[in-house]
A protein has these predicted regions:
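Short, glycine-/small- and polar/acidic-enriched structural segments
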Residues: 12-184, 197, 201, 224
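Small-molecule pocket liners
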Residues: 127-133, 137-139, 233-237, 242, ...
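Extracellular mucin-like PTS domains
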Residues: 1-17
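Pocket-lining segment of extracytoplasmic ligand-binding domains
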Residues: 108-109, 183-286
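Conserved C-terminal helix/tail region of periplasmic/extracytoplasmic solute-binding proteins
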Residues: 320-364
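Secondary-structure end/capping motifs
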Residues: 247-337
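Short, solvent-exposed loop/beta-turn-alpha elements that line the ligand-binding surface or hinge
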Residues: 53-71, 223-225, 229-230, 245, ...
Length: 364
């Protein structure tokens, strides 16, 4: 069962009954992230009190779980992912360690693992994935979109096996000769090309890093979100299928707290970003992430509508037709890679809106 049994029902005096999760949720709600602390994965840090306990050996942070600053009577433990878990995918980690209640699983990954390690996403922490293709405007004057970049023949550096690239070439947006899967995330190849190459990245990271942190380049990049072309998985918090029933009462109270946390972060990201940067420094893992990049990421997520309301006006909701299209689009791509998507997979198999409070939304 996720970390401990349901917590003691004797709630502390400071716990408001309106937001109390005590006795309903596990006493410690464990959230597995997909990387070291960064603004993209803001939501569990947004819910965590700033005076928690840092475990530098296993790269985790445990603190009181707060609902807009109010103590809920349970704790949250946020675990770093990526190299901190041996570069294992989050669902694999969730299946190995049943103490993990929630993990970051984008819906394309949910589709990919639907027959082997299925998960169900219970809230979309962001409406769009921040995945981009970026390029130098100086080297590619007049190129404003990925499809225009496709007409230049420029090499596009990307992580080999990324399914969105199979989609972009299959749809004729990029030519099959353009992708170079040898990219490892370091700037060396891009810099060596003098900016003639384009590269995969995140709207929340590379445009800032190449302008401010890559001393060999130190110039801005132009970019476009891959989701603009119809490859648009949701970044989401997911759980194992059996937990949907087992923790239904918990999720009914927790998910609206998460939704409000998204709204609160969009309005005032500073305190959470400060916690994220502090944890990066304390983990001291070789991952570099400073306050400038965190602030840039928070601002970009709002301005690029990565953090946004869903079409129905609710923050955190999934759109079934969008997920259906993604399933249709990905099935042949994964089949080519020898991965079998569950037969007859529906959006309801991998996502649910049942725990959302439809009244919670971003202003505007």
């Amino acid at each position: 069962t996720p970390a401990d049994s349901p917590s003691s029902s004797t709630s502390k005096a400071a716990v408001s009954s309106a937001v109390s999760l005590a006795g309903i949720c596990p006493s410690t709600i464990v959230v597995q992230t997909d990387w070291y602390p960064e603004a993209d994965d803001f939501i569990p840090y947004q819910l965590a009190a700033a005076n928690g306990t840092v475990n530098t050996s296993n790269k985790s942070y445990t603190a009181e779980l707060l609902a807009s600053g109010k103590d809920t009577g349970v704790k949250i433990q946020v675990r770093a992912g990526g190299p901190a878990i041996g570069d294992q995918l989050v669902p694999a980690e969730m299946y190995e360690d049943s103490s993990i209640l929630l993990g970051f699983v984008e819906t394309d990954e949910g589709i990919e693992l639907s027959s082997t390690q299925p998960t169900v996403a219970i809230v979309a922490d962001r409406q769009e994935a921040p995945t981009i293709i970026a390029w130098s405007a100086a080297e590619h004057p007049g190129v404003k979109t990925i499809s225009q970049l496709g007409k230049t023949g420029a090499t596009v550096l990307y992580y080999n096996g990324a399914p969105f690239m199979s989609y972009l070439t299959g749809a004729g947006i990029l030519s099959s000769k353009q992708p170079d899967g040898a990219y490892n995330g370091t700037p060396a190849q891009f810099v060596a090309s003098g900016g003639k190459d384009a590269l995969q990245g995140f709207a929340t990271a590379e445009p800032y890093e190449y302008a401010h942190e890559v001393s060999q380049w130190d110039k801005p990049l132009t970019y476009q979100l891959v989701s603009d072309y119809g490859y648009d998985p949701y970044p989401a918090l997911a759980t194992l299928p059996q937990n949907i029933t087992k923790y239904a009462a918990c999720f009914k109270k927790l998910v609206p707290i998460i939704q409000q946390g998204i709204v609160d972060y969009a309005k005032n990201p500073g305190p959470t970003d400060a916690l994220i940067v502090k944890l990066v420094q304390e983990y001291n893992s070789g991952w570099e992430y400073d306050a400038g990049e965190a602030a840039y990421a928070a601002k970009t997520m709002v301005s690029d509508k990565i953090i946004a309301n869903s079409p129905d006006g609710t923050v955190g909701a999934f759109d079934d037709s969008r997920i259906s299209k993604l399933i249709t689009l990905l099935r042949p791509i994964y089949a080519r890679d020898g991965k079998t998507v569950k037969a007859g997979l529906t959006p309801q198999d991998i996502t649910t809106n049942q725990f959302l409070d439809p009244s919670i939304h971003l202003p505007g």
